[in-house]
C-alpha cells in the first residue's frame, strides 16, 4: 500500500471522517464512518465523479465547521486534472475553499480542501 501524508490537510480537530471512492492501493490510515460526519474525503477517478462528490456532500448533514476534500491523481493526460475538476465547483456557491486549499499529499496525489456552506 502507498502511504499518504494527511497532516497537510489540517484535520486534527475533526473526529468523524468518511472516505469515498478511494482506491485500495492507497492507505489513508483513517477509520471511515457514516456517523456524525464532519469531513468527506472523495477520490476523483473520472470527471463524472465530480457530480457524485457534490451529491454526496450536499446530501450529507455536515456541521457548520466541516471539510469536503477532493483527491485526484497528479499528471494525468486523460482530461482529469485540477482545472477540469474544479471548473464545476467554482460555479457552485455551496462550497468555499479552506486552508490549505490545494496541496500535495503524496508523490502521486493532490488534494483540494473545501467546506460545504451550511
Where are these regions (language model features)?
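Charge-dense, helix-prone N-terminal extensions
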Residues: 1-118
Amino acid at each position: 500500500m502507498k502511504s499518504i501524508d494527511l497532516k497537510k490537510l489540517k484535520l486534527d480537530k475533526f473526529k468523524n471522517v468518511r472516505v469515498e471512492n478511494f482506491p485500495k492501493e492507497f492507505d489513508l490510515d483513517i477509520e471511515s464512518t457514516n456517523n456524525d460526519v464532519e469531513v468527506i474525503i472523495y477520490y476523483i477517478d473520472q470527471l463524472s465523479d465530480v457530480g457524485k462528490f457534490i451529491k454526496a456532500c450536499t446530501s450529507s448533514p455536515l456541521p457548520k465547521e466541516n471539510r469536503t476534500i477532493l483527491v485526484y491523481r497528479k499528471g494525468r493526460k486523460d482530461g482529469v486534472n485540477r482545472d477540469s475538476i474544479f471548473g464545476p465547483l467554482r460555479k457552485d456557491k455551496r462550497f468555499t475553499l479552506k486552508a490549505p486549499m490545494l496541496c500535495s499529499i503524496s508523490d502521486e496525489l493532490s488534494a483540494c480542501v473545501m467546506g460545504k456552506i451550511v
